[in-house]
Amino acid sequence: MAGKARVHELAKELGVTSKEVLARLGEQGEFVKSASSTVEAPVARRLRESFGGNKPDAVKPAAGASNGAPAKPSAPGARPGPRPGPPAPAQPKEPPAPAAPAAAAPAPAAPAPPAAPPAPAASAAPPSAPEAPSARPTPGPRPGPGGPKPGAPKPAPRTPRVGNNPFSSQQPVERPAPRPQGPAGPGGPRPGPGAGGPRPGGGPRPGATPGNMPPRPVGGPRPGGGPRPGGGPRPGAGPRPTPGGAGRPGGGGGGNYRGGGAGGGGGAGGAAAGGFRGRPGGGGGRPGQRGGAAGAFGRPGGAPKRGRKSKRAKRAEYENMQAPVVGGVRLPHGNGETIRLARGASLSDFADKINANPASLVQALFNLGEMVTATQSVNDETLELLGGEMNYVVQVVSPEDEDRELLQSFDLSYGEDEGGEDDLEFRPPVVTVMGHVDHGKTRLLDTIRDATVREGEAGGITQHIGAYQVTVDLDGNERPITFIDTPGHEAFTAMRARGAKATDIAILVVAADDGVMPQTVEAVNHAQAADVPIVVAVNKIDKEGADPAKIRGQLTEYGLVPEEYGGDTMFVDISAKAGTNIEALLEAVVLTADASLDLRANPDMEAQGVAIEAHLDRGRGPVATVLIQRGTLRVGDSVVAGDAYGRVRRMVDEHGEDVEEALPSRPVQVIGFTSVPGAGDNFLVVDEDRIARQIADRRSARKRNALAARTRKRISLEDLDSALKETSQLNLILKGDNSGTVEALEEALLGIQVDDEVQLRVIDRGVGGVTETNVNLASASDAIIIGFNVRAEGKATELANREGVEIRYYSIIYQAIDEIESALKGMLKPIYEEKELGRAEIRAIFRSSKVGNIAGCLVQSGIMRRNAKARLLRDNVVVAQNLTVSSLKREKDDATEVREGYECGLTLTYNDIKEGDVIETYELVEKART
């Protein structure tokens, strides 16, 4: 059948139901939707082949029977020559087969009358039909032009016997090429049996064309191989040709020759069987051998594939069987291996690690109630949960480990001295002054270095870290000591923690008249967490009410036991203002350093340290205060600190003087960064600017991802409804004089406790004055600009006034926190509480066509007020609420309100009222938020 055929047409042709055809197509790997769908010609051919052996036609069963025998002989394809003789023994089941060889001779002589024999052959077919069933019907259906394609007789084939070959419709005519080959090679020897001559009769085989399909029934001739001498048997074996011709084009032809001869001479059924045996070379249509009709589009013939799956499909199916189902989506299944992910990683990063599709992970989380995108940063808990569902152990790499791996990728290391013991030299101790606000930390440092830094601090509160190196004369020896001053206000927790990590010894300043305060305890915790020795300075001993003994007792509770109490912590009573016992304090610091610390470093390596503070200077650009911990920093070095990099163009000490190099434990201001580094960032020297830039860029990307994962509020499906409601949001842009202050301010603001109705969002932060860029961003996002110790630059103020952008300036951090907290609370939706006005009982009801039911009431308590909110009670049960007193009259006059004890008439926005009902009126009063 040329062209496409519909499933129901094929079903009708094959005598089966459409469902069976659809099922068979499914087994063959073809996707067909319904009985009205069309299938390609090659698919239809394979379908007919698969149903051929099952057809009820008598002819086909015969073919099947004959096929059964050939199957075995086909294996010894090399023996086609001798075949003529053995057919009889080989086919014990079919006695007629032996006779076939004898009759082979006459067969060749009758090539011309092939047309006539078909009829008798058909009649002969029925007898053999019963035997066919026992044989394998499946191979039978495989037609193949190969067998009958003997060499010389090729031309004859052109006159095909349409009706002879029941399977001819499945044999493409293009088999001619192989036919010639058959005779060419093995064909020569095979003709020996004498069948070679008549073999040309095989020509009819080729005649088989797609259009011959209908003639299948006529295929009966197979059994009647006798009637058709030469070609008769051949066509009968037509279905078998698969093996003979295609399986071994050359030899196959010869084999078929012999078989043909043998079959031809024999009786109808026997001949067919014999013929098959004679040309089993084709393998009796075995799939292994490419015998039988050629497939469409040049595909080899052979048994139908029956929808066999490819190895790849089987492998995929097996893997899918092992895959867990999370949220209705199939995902890879791990073996408990550990997956390392950076903090703030996205689902795409996770998918790359486990070789999965990011869309599947997104769908899985969506079905589990989490709405995230493939590129959105995901928090650690979500990644661990998703990994656990797939049998993976997700390990979120800490920032320290991630940074270490980053440096290792550039063959760099941080935190260790290079060289041996001989390369280490003494370095000065680094001392951090810590304590509660206003306890005298900066005054103590001023007294030590004879400076007046305290007067420059707003409100007398230290706003950022200062690092200084002073030289102390102890017992005739000059000992340099580096001091780091930290702020004591509660908002500067992170800055105190950095100071503790960068120090060797901590001086804890406690006011003798104030005692241990919250920030005092916090400073103790920071120092103990960093394993830093503590020297306690009890300050303000000259003030009234000072009680140093009380301080010692309080600090004992926190593990700081004085030496006089049998502990190992040195306590020194001082007065920073009067300069009392300052020398004793410094001596205690040096003794502690010498006794418990190994203060050595290698000055010959490339410099490493920590950025204590950083700010943006109008004339000098980004300026970072760095503390060198090991190595020597020189002008011209390529440096990287956090996500900032650059080349050292200038270094300045605490006195404002330029220095060419800085040794370990020396604090200096470095100028030359391309951006402002963060306070507390690691600082190190690299070989090239290129390496510094690459490290900084990768740190910056990692920082953005981590920040996004921390600040982005995830919305679950359960919260979606409430999230879509209108919420108030206060956007802020923070600008400060240094990075540490900006960081502390941001942490304090984000920590303000307000209702979920209001959100605080810091959309930008930076160091330096307020610029026009900041104003434009604030205008576009309805943000407020907070300037801390900075002012607007150039035309920024004019632009802000024109755009209506609010800029607020602060110099004291807690003032900024208080005002912003008040602003947030002002954005909250007001809270209303109900205040009862009065109660009235309905004594009579008057009906009006204009206004509805009118209630005649007696005011029992309070007042009835027009347009007031009301509710209707019946037997002390609320019948209706959120009502309004539409009109109110006292006798015949309109009234605004009616007091207790008076009668009135009123109408409500509700008509189902009865006598005896009670009307309560009330008003909503806004309640101040606390």
UniProtKB/Swiss-Prot annotation:
Keywords: Cytoplasm, GTP-binding, Initiation factor, Nucleotide-binding, Protein biosynthesis. The keyword Nucleotide-binding applies. Pfam families: EF-G_D2, GTP_EFTU, IF-2, IF2_N. Residues 31-317 are annotated as: Disordered. PROSITE patterns: G_TR_2 (PS51722), IF2 (PS01176). Residues 426-598 form the tr-type G domain. It comes from Mycolicibacterium gilvum (strain PYR-GCK) (Mycobacterium gilvum (strain PYR-GCK)). Residues 61-78, 121-135 have a biased composition (Low complexity). Residues 79-99, 108-120, 136-158, 178-192, 212-242 have a biased composition (Pro residues). One of the essential components for the initiation of protein synthesis. Protects formylmethionyl-tRNA from spontaneous hydrolysis and promotes its binding to the 30S ribosomal subunits. Also involved in the hydrolysis of GTP during the formation of the 70S ribosomal complex. GTP binds at residues 435-442, 485-489, 539-542. Belongs to the TRAFAC class translation factor GTPase superfamily. Classic translation factor GTPase family. IF-2 subfamily. One of its GO terms (molecular function) is GTPase activity. The keyword Thylakoid does not apply. Residues 460-464 are annotated as: G2. It is found in: Cytoplasm. GO terms for cellular component: cytosol. PANTHER family: TR-TYPE G DOMAIN-CONTAINING PROTEIN, TRANSLATION INITIATION FACTOR IF-2-RELATED. Residues 193-205, 244-301 have a biased composition (Gly residues). Residues 305-314 have a biased composition (Basic residues). InterPro entries: EF-G-like_DII, IF2_II, IF2_N, P-loop_NTPase, Small_GTP-bd, T_Tr_GTP-bd_dom, TF_IF2_bacterial-like, TIF_IF2. Residues 575-577 are annotated as: G5. This is Translation initiation factor IF-2. Residues 435-442 are annotated as: G1.
